[in-house]
Amino acid sequence: MTKSKPATKKNEWTVKDSCSLYGLDLWGEEYFSINDSGNVTVSPQGKEGNSLELTHLLEELKGRNLNTPLLLRFDDILEDRLKKLHQAFENAINQYGYNNDYQGVFPIKCNQQRHVVEEIVTIGRKWHFGLEAGSKAELLIALALVNDPKAFLICNGYKDNRYIETTILARQLGRQPIVVIEQSDEVGRIIKASQKLGAAPLIGIRAKLSNQSSGRWGNSVGEKSKFGLSIPEILKAVQELTAAGLLNELILLHFHVGSQINDIAILKNALQEASQIYVELNRLGAPMGHLDVGGGLGVDYDGSRTATSASTNYSLQNYANDVVATIQECCKAKKVKVPKLISESGRFLSSHFSILIFNVLGTSSVPTQIAIETSNECLSVKNLRETLMILHQICEEKKIDVSKLQEAWNDALKFKEDALNAFRLGFIDLTERATAEQLTWACAKQIAAHLPNDLKIPKELLAINKGLTETYYANISIFRSAPDTWAIQQLFPLLPIHRLQEKPDQLGHFADLTCDSDGKLARFINNGQEKFLLELHTVKANENYWIGMFLGGAYQEVMGNLHNLFGSTNAIHIRLTKNGKYKLDHVVRGNSKSDVLQAMEHDSEQLLERIRMASESAIQQGSLKINDAQRLIEHVETSLRQSTYLQE
């Protein structure tokens, strides 16, 4: 891993500076780095394995007609994350002498893509790793893919009679589905289904903890949380199960404190409360034996190791240690056998393995070129020219007076407004208005280039930089590929994957392809904080400028939508080979235009026929030549088969 170090010589820029700037040595763990050529590399097997240069990989994928935007899925990273998770719990179990083991499950909702779930099931078989389902459709996936009789199928979510009956029948297939009671009325459904089929499911109860959480998913716990039983409801459920002769099937307690726990103290409090509930259920006669601590094992998106929304103040080993130690302490005090531990750590497992790569289509910036002065310019334009001259003089002073900069900027804004008012009233023409805008931006650029590093800089002057930034047009839809950036303001690491031996010379943000003002990436990680501009390079003519969004393997693909009918991108599953090279295990083609049209109930053949009929009519009227009509139809036919994104 490249370590952060400032450049040693004045004006010299190195890959170490880029590594520090984008935080790669903080959030990249053992997987992502920068080589001496300034290109991002991925080491899917961690520090012990070989690395791949992403730009080289992209060039070879282009040779296979697989162009950006692309999702690169590194299945070796999935395997490495599974190994790390089990190793952490094994270490904790050995350290504390915990007399049971850990056996996790993957929540299908994190990434429901078939190849992803299949890969996790295959890799996880050595640990009897199972799946968690939160719906009837996800239950069917779990039943079909998990054929290990020792692996758990945790059945969460709302349940009707058919859901529960399916789990009972699946148990007779040799599977281990555990129906987790999350609503009080599910107790009656379980009893009814058991009586109907003459068999019972394995049963768990989700507790609604009183402990308060924090962050975006803080409402996952507490008295008003969506799922779980309150303490009175748990006691009532035990009574009903006892009366129905089903208490012996109650083997699991489950709780959940949010998708991303950023503060380990929240988990500790939840573990203490849940452990007490567990021993009480055992005391009431339930066999128990299993404690599911839910999801929440967090991902440090910015590498700051802080209790912020984009980070965590604990490591994986801290997490495993606290789970094991807290539960053991409580059970030991009450002389209850410690349970088998289960977690639903989907975000931790799947975030790192997927990288979204997109190309920049172009850029735009504010107009700062100054028009040649003419003799009959209006007063506001003359005043703006004079203000710009004053700014040049201020900036040539040995010590720049910020108050003078502020005064000049206030003048520039007033003169610009004068020009706009004159244009609205018809006193100046479009050319003079354009000149006024150019001069105003030239004033802004002059101020931004000479602002001293002073904490007392007025906010109005600090905001100038934001107005001068470049907009980089990205060949993606954030609503399809990064919906959490829009929906919950999630931060993901973004950076160029090449040219990192060069010092960035621009500040910018990204605008996507959608016709939506929310379609942008304008918030970026910044070592525990966030920034609204990203350091980027000037895009060179006739050269690709590739950007990578990292740590997006959980939820982004499955929650994306078809806004403006931009569909899924191509997804490539990549594995390292023993000779140090790589192979493409799976190529999952993204949506074509025909696919997304069909999703909205537009039949491609019908659309094509309507265009053909319109062309024929135009031919009859003499407004369209036959060869041009054929060319149009061929264009449409080809376009229907192609990606919804722009072609390189």
UniProtKB/Swiss-Prot annotation:
Catalytic activity: L-arginine + H(+) = agmatine + CO2
The protein, known as: Biosynthetic arginine decarboxylase
EC number(s) on file: 4.1.1.19
NCBIfam families: PRK05354.1, speA
Family per record: Belongs to the Orn/Lys/Arg decarboxylase class-II family. SpeA subfamily.
GO molecular function: arginine decarboxylase activity; metal ion binding
Cross-referenced Pfam families: Arg_decarb_HB, Arg_decarbox_C, Orn_Arg_deC_N
Modified residues (N6-(pyridoxal phosphate)lysine): K109
Keywords tagged on the record: Decarboxylase, Lyase, Magnesium, Metal-binding, Polyamine biosynthesis, Pyridoxal phosphate, Spermidine biosynthesis
Cofactor requirements of the protein: Mg(2+); pyridoxal 5'-phosphate
One example of a Gene Ontology biological process annotation: spermidine biosynthetic process
Function: Catalyzes the biosynthesis of agmatine from arginine.
Binding sites annotated in the UniProt record for substrate: L291, D292, V293, G294, G295, G296, L297, G298, V299, D300, Y301
